[in-house]
UniProtKB/Swiss-Prot annotation:
Family, per entry: Belongs to the peptidase C5 family.
Protein name, per record: Protease
GO BP of this protein: proteolysis
Other noteworthy facts: All late proteins expressed from the major late promoter are produced by alternative splicing and alternative polyadenylation of the same gene giving rise to non-overlapping ORFs. A leader sequence is present in the N-terminus of all these mRNAs and is recognized by the viral shutoff protein to provide expression although conventional translation via ribosome scanning from the cap has been shut off in the host cell.
Taxonomic source organism: Human adenovirus A serotype 12 (HAdV-12)
Keywords: Autocatalytic cleavage, Disulfide bond, DNA-binding, Host nucleus, Hydrolase, Late protein, Protease, Thiol protease, Virion
Any single GO CC term annotated in Swiss-Prot or TrEMBL for this entry: host cell nucleus
Activity regulation text: Requires DNA and protease cofactor for maximal activation. Inside nascent virions, becomes partially activated by binding to the viral DNA, allowing it to cleave the cofactor that binds to the protease and fully activates it. Actin, like the viral protease cofactor, seems to act as a cofactor in the cleavage of cytokeratin 18 and of actin itself.
Gene3D superfamilies, per the entry: Adenoviral Proteinase, Chain A (3.40.395.10)
Amino acid sequence: MGSSEQELTAIVRDLGCGPYFLGTFDKRFPGFVSRDRLSCAIVNTAGRETGGVHWLAFGWNPKSHTCYLFDPFGFSDQRLKQIYQFEYESLLRRSALAATKDRCVTLEKSTQTVQGPFSAACGLFCCMFLHAFTHWPDHPMDKNPTMDLLTGVPNCMLQSPQVVGTLQRNQNELYKFLNNLSPYFRHNRERIEKATSFTKMQNGLK
């Protein structure tokens, strides 16, 4: 089943992101409400009524006027639209970010894959990214102690047998990271790992 909204919220708070975390949202995320405040959110590509499909993480750094979009699969804009019918451009337009003085916002998006194709851990990877974002907001994607635990591979190799070992190690590193920093994860580890396992989505099963 992957991760529930309540679960992700509990883990994000354990990771120290609480003061900046706006919450979990479905595809109707209204955007960032304050252009002057460091803030972040976890957003699903589908409507809440569907039960959810895929989690993404967003972060806004007012100092650099940069909006970060983290997708554990590193899909291109076109693929996000093709697979999930999800577009974030309208999200940025209706956000308070459009009210910046020069209306100039830099979008930095993850382009590499860190999650296996059959893994259901997208929400947990988003929690990990938000830890990096709130602690190193000027370079949350890489070159920080959190995200450097993961090894990205080109998105075009997502289904390649050559990278299975790398992506499996990423998920193991993710679990170790959360086990170290999140009491909620520790107390519920067996259930969470079963629900988000590396092969959870194989054969189309959730």
